[in-house]
């Protein structure tokens, strides 16, 4: 008996919609990364993108535990000398709430071309509406 290996053209990809209201950021991101990778499927193959598309709604209502709301700091660099920037979790939620979930999930995916392909299947929206109705996403309760 030969070991099964998924072929990229034969992978069945479904669309799911997740409501992030009141969900803990890390626990939500872990499950999203797992499903983007395809590890929940029997035909999971490490070197093939077998994951599903995931739409996350209400990113602004994601929860964090403890004092992370005021203490957690996100850093990025502009590329110029002395151009390091920082923002707290509260500031990120106020300015670009989608980025909080995107950053958390991206850090849990593989680094490299395959990880970037998996990351592109994540669609995050701050509000309660999305423009992927044509894909008929199924509600996923995490």
Curated annotation (Swiss-Prot):
Gene Ontology biological-process annotations: negative regulation of translation; translation
Keyword hit for Ribosomal protein: yes
UniProt-listed PROSITE patterns: RIBOSOMAL_L13
Any matching Pfam family: Ribosomal_L13
InterPro entries referenced in this protein's UniProt entry, alphabetically: Ribosomal_uL13, Ribosomal_uL13_bac-type, Ribosomal_uL13_CS, Ribosomal_uL13_sf
Keyword field: Ribonucleoprotein, Ribosomal protein
Family: Belongs to the universal ribosomal protein uL13 family.
Any one Gene Ontology molecular-function term assigned to this protein's record: structural constituent of ribosome
Lineage: Bacteria, Pseudomonadati, Pseudomonadota, Gammaproteobacteria, Enterobacterales
GO CC terms in record: cytosolic large ribosomal subunit
Record text on subunit structure and interactions: Part of the 50S ribosomal subunit.
Gene name as annotated: rplM
Protein name as catalogued: Large ribosomal subunit protein uL13
Function text: This protein is one of the early assembly proteins of the 50S ribosomal subunit, although it is not seen to bind rRNA by itself. It is important during the early stages of 50S assembly.
């Amino acid at each position: 008996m030969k070991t099964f290996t998924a072929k990229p053209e034969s992978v069945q990809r479904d669309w799911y919609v997740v409501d992030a209201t009141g969900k803990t950021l890390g626990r939500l991101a872990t499950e999203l990364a797992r499903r983007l990778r395809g590890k929940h499927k029997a035909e999971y193959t490490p070197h093939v993108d077998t994951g599903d598309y995931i739409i996350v709604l209400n990113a602004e209502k994601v929860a964090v535990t403890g004092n992370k709301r005021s203490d957690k700091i996100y850093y990025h660099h502009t590329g110029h000398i002395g151009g390091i920037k920082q923002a707290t979790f509260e500031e990120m939620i106020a300015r670009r709430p989608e980025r909080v979930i995107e950053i958390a999930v991206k850090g849990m995916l593989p680094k490299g071309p395959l990880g970037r392909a998996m990351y592109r299947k994540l669609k995050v929206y701050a509000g309660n509406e999305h423009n992927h109705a044509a894909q008929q996403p199924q509600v996923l309760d995490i």
